[in-house]
Structure formats: C-alpha cells, structure tokens
Amino acid sequence: MGKESGWDSGRAAVAAVVGGVVAVGTVLVALSAMGFTSVGIAASSIAAKMMSTAAIANGGGVAAGSLVAILQSVGAAGLSVTSKVIGGFAGTALGAWLGSPPSS
C-alpha cells in the first residue's frame, strides 16, 4: 500500500508514534485530574470519594493492592519503566490501528 493506492503509509507510522506518546503522557495528567497527586489524595476529589468507598467496603481501611492503593502509588511516585513500556506499546498499537486505511 503505497501512494498509488491513495494511502500514505507514513500516516500509520505517525499515528503509532503519537498514540504511544499520548498513552504514556496522559496517565499522570489523568490521575492528577482525578485527585491522585504527588502529595497524596486531594480533598473533595474523585480520588477521595474512591478512597472513602473502598475504606467503608473494607471495614475502615484501604486494602494494599486495591485499585485505589495502586492509583495512589502511581499518582505519588509515577509510572515504572515497565508500565511506561507496556502503555507505550498499547498506545502505539491503538494509534497504528486508528491510522491504518479503512477496510474495503
């Protein structure tokens, strides 16, 4: 599939790169917007509501390894290299798929 078919194969490559960068770059922004910040959970945020719900459901504490605990950890410390690589691959695959030519 080259220019003769009306499709620029570079478009899929650009979409793949953009997808990978966006996938990794938006994680911390999204978590911060939810209230999982580098200094802890922000008051009156979605994160605070999630933590309250998890604590009530668990008898007063948030269980280690729960979704809230994991998101709090990522919000405070950032993503590990492995998580960035996995997220980058997922974003790259999605970007390549979205940038590919439509099926005939």
From Swiss-Prot:
Membrane topology: Multi-pass membrane protein
Entry's Gene Ontology molecular function annotations: molecular adaptor activity
InterPro entries: IFI6/IFI27-like (IPR009311), IFI6/IFI27-like_sf (IPR038213)
Domain of life of the source: Eukaryota
Residues passing through the membrane, by range: 14-34, 59-79, 81-101
Annotated Gene Ontology cellular component terms: mitochondrial membrane
Localisation per UniProt entry: Membrane
Transmembrane recorded as keyword: yes
A GO BP entry: intrinsic apoptotic signaling pathway
UniProt keyword annotations, A-Z: Apoptosis, Membrane, Transmembrane, Transmembrane helix
Entry-linked Pfam families: Ifi-6-16
Similarity remark: Belongs to the IFI6/IFI27 family.
Function statement: Plays a role in the apoptotic process and has a pro-apoptotic activity.
Listed PANTHER family: INTERFERON ALPHA-INDUCIBLE PROTEIN 27, INTERFERON ALPHA-INDUCIBLE PROTEIN 27-LIKE PROTEIN 1
Protein name per the record: Interferon alpha-inducible protein 27-like protein 1
Organism: Homo sapiens (Human)
Lineage of origin: Eukaryota, Metazoa, Chordata, Craniata, Vertebrata
